[in-house]
Amino acid sequence: MQCALYDAGRCRSCQWITQPIPEQLSAKTADLKNLLADFPVEEWCAPVSGPEQGFRNKAKMVVSGSVEKPLLGMLHRDGTPEDLCDCPLYPASFAPVFAALKPFIARAGLTPYNVARKRGELKYILLTESQSDGGMMLRFVLRSETKLAQLRKALPWLQEQLPQLKVITVNIQPVHMAIMEGETEIYLTEQQALAERFNDVPLWIRPQSFFQTNPAVASQLYATARDWVRQLPVKHMWDLFCGVGGFGLHCATPDMQLTGIEIASEAIACAKQSAAELGLTRLQFQALDSTQFATAQGEVPELVLVNPPRRGIGKPLCDYLSTMAPRFIIYSSCNAQTMAKDVRELPGYRIERVQLFDMFPHTAHYEVLTLLVKQ
């Protein structure tokens, strides 16, 4: 992938950009095999990759510069700003949005937040695109509600320029820290969720719900999990750390009982909406802590699917699963190091199948799907 920002030494986020994709995949596979070297793996499936560029469905832009000439991108460690509107990871559809946002920031008088001076209002612009219909969600992260009335007043101009903006919100993040968003979300549109569709499964994206940033690879990840589950004698499963329900909604059948657990209530609202659309009445989604939910149960289903954050599922949940011994565990991980650590805490299981998904090209990161079977 060619990147003028990298070539000019202005951005180093894609540290592996000079390596061809096959070499990147080989290095990631070697890393994964090294992490799982202590465990016999019955089947290594071929790694899955997607497009080299233009694959991201989300942009997280730090806003800097002046209100007349805002920059959208990032801050270097020394505080100097870098405009990343031309980043080749973004699809071509993002360029006209960035182009319209710069004059809009001036029109609405949204002074960019100055980290050094702790002054200004507009901290971040967060943009998400649906692959299914090209609709977009735009979030303005502000320090306070001071400029909210001005933003509302100027908004019709932006909506006229960009009819693809289906969901527009303001998020209030008052703290002087590098935190992307605060708790308060103010909707400026009637529509509150972005419609997405993977493999004929309707999914919803709300402002404060996590959603995978590489839809081409994520849709293959969900489809693979569905195929693996279909091969197992499973009538009842848990989907822990379920997010918007991507795994559970793909794996569920009309006669299967499924419970999805996720701490973020926004994500659970999305999952419930999808389940209702699919007419799946035996699916239950609840906004709870996954570990607390599981360890309070006196029995387990045949299959437990886990998709934890980078820290992994942790020892308490590993101990519980070891004791309760569901017949199958499917572990989806964005951090193979913590997954390997967790697998070590599940001594009663063998690894039947592993597959790497190159969710984050040009970096050392990857997603991995692992099927564990009780010995």
Curated annotation (Swiss-Prot):
InterPro entries: 23SrRNA_MeTrfase_RlmC, MeTrfase_TrmA_AS, MeTrfase_TrmA_CS, SAM-dependent_MTases_sf, U5_MeTrfase_fam. SUPFAM superfamilies: S-adenosyl-L-methionine-dependent methyltransferases. Its EC number is 2.1.1.189. GO terms for molecular function: 4 iron, 4 sulfur cluster binding; iron ion binding; rRNA (uridine-C5-)-methyltransferase activity. The active site is at C334 (nucleophile). S-adenosyl-L-methionine binds at Q212, F241, E262, N307. One of its GO terms (biological process) is rRNA base methylation. CDD domains: AdoMet_MTases. Keywords: 4Fe-4S, Iron, Iron-sulfur, Metal-binding, Methyltransferase, rRNA processing, S-adenosyl-L-methionine, Transferase. It holds the Pfam family tRNA_U5-meth_tr. [4Fe-4S] cluster binds at C3, C11, C14, C87. PROSITE patterns: SAM_MT_RNA_M5U (PS51687), TRMA_1 (PS01230), TRMA_2 (PS01231). It is an enzyme of class 2 (transferase). It catalyses: uridine(747) in 23S rRNA + S-adenosyl-L-methionine = 5-methyluridine(747) in 23S rRNA + S-adenosyl-L-homocysteine + H(+). Gene3D superfamilies: 2.40.50.1070, Vaccinia Virus protein VP39. Belongs to the class I-like SAM-binding methyltransferase superfamily. RNA M5U methyltransferase family. RlmC subfamily. Catalyzes the formation of 5-methyl-uridine at position 747 (m5U747) in 23S rRNA. This is 23S rRNA (uracil(747)-C(5))-methyltransferase RlmC. It comes from Escherichia coli (strain SE11).
